[in-house]
A protein has these predicted regions:
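Short amphipathic alpha helix immediately N-terminal
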Residues: 136-155
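Arg/Lys-rich amphipathic alpha helix in sigma70-family domain 2
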Residues: 63-81, 89-98, 183
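Structural recognition of an alpha-helix C-terminal capping motif at a helix-to-coil junction
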Residues: 32-39, 52-64
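A short, charge-rich alpha-helical start-of-domain segment used by transcription regulators
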Residues: 1-18, 28-31, 42
Length: 318
């Protein structure tokens, strides 16, 4: 394969990552799927006859890769998808394996910075944690149909050609997928991280968290805020329980420092806990959901693995 064709493949990496992420629910698996797609495309380049666009050909390969990866796998979810809320004094159950959970993805890996603003808002909506979790309720082929038709705006005939099926089958799968998603509760989130009011809220949140002023922090939370900490299945509902947790089992977060990033179309922060005098180490990637000027979701993804994926430093020094 020529260098030129290789560069043509790379042009599509970001959008393929977004597609595979929606299909798989894991940023790590999405990266693996895209890499496998590129390898297969590279090896099969001589057989690409050009009857379809390079983009369509790549999506066919990526879809097959994702379907292969999903064969026999369990449905990924958020803690609130698996059971009722707990209270702050609940004893933590053991953490569940990584393949239990939806994992966050950095916006830059899936969203084109030069996209049309209206299109960018729509794409943010379709990488929200709640939406990606809802997609996992669909059988894999239905999932592919819905993403290609509803998110990427492909024609039914294009999807039928990709999946080697009929237009009627595509339309039927789309109807079933829509019906399933209508039964899944989707949280509402204000997806305008650059909005001045939202920026002010985030500044106040970081200030309260770093000072560990829990009264101030709780005042920023929505009455129906949800708080979770994958890999633990426990989740909390309401400002009171979140505040109790922060002052109780979560008190080890006192003295943390925060670095801003973005994930799943939302504001996010790398939280670094004190490790030794003058040194802070990765603890949690926090993804914040906001609605009506208050924080409605606090998703704390524990562990250092995501920090490297998000380009965050391995430690902070005073």
């Amino acid at each position: 394969m020529s260098t030129t064709v290789g560069l043509d493949l790379e042009v599509h990496r970001r959008e393929l990552t977004g597609y595979c992420y929606r299909m798989l629910g894991s940023s790590f698996e999405a990266e693996d799927a895209v890499q496998e797609t590129m390898v297969r495309a590279w090896r099969a380049a001589d057989s690409f006859e050009g009857r379809s666009a390079l983009k369509s050909w790549l999506y066919r390969i990526a879809t097959n890769v994702c379907l292969d990866m999903l064969r026999g796998s369990q449905r990924r979810a958020r803690p609130m998808d698996l059971g009722p809320s707990s209270t702050a004094d609940t004893v933590l159950a053991p953490g569940l394996p990584e393949n239990t959970w939806i994992t966050p993805v950095q916006d830059d890996r899936v969203l084109a910075p030069d996209a049309d603003p209206a299109e960018l808002t729509e794409y943010r909506e379709t990488i929200r944690l709640a939406f990606v979790a809802a997609l996992q309720h669909l059988p894999p082929r239905q999932r592919a149909v819905l993403i290609l038709r509803e998110v990427l705006r492909w024609q039914a005939s294009e999807v039928a050609e990709l999946l080697e099926t009929s237009v009627g089958s595509v339309n039927s799968a789309l109807q079933r997928a829509r019906a399933t998603l209508e039964e899944v509760e989707l949280d509402t989130t204000d997806l305008s991280p650059a909005d001045p009011k939202q920026q002010e809220l985030l500044t106040r949140y970081v200030d309260a968290f770093e000072r560990y002023d829990i009264d101030s922090l709780v005042s920023l939370l929505h009455d129906e805020v949800k708080f979770c900490m994958p890999p633990y299945p426990m989740w909390l509902s309401g400002p009171l329980e979140v505040g109790r947790w922060m002052l109780g089992p979560g008190a080890g977060c006192r003295g943390s420092r925060m670095l801003a990033t973005s994930a799943n179309g939302c504001a996010a922060f790398g939280q670094y806990r004190p490790a030794s005098p003058g040194v802070h180490e990765p603890w949690s990637l926090q993804v914040l959901e906001i609605s009506d000027g208050r924080i409605t979701g606090l998703h704390n993804f524990l562990g250092p693995e995501l920090f490297e994926a998000f380009g965050l430093p391995a430690r902070l020094f005073d």
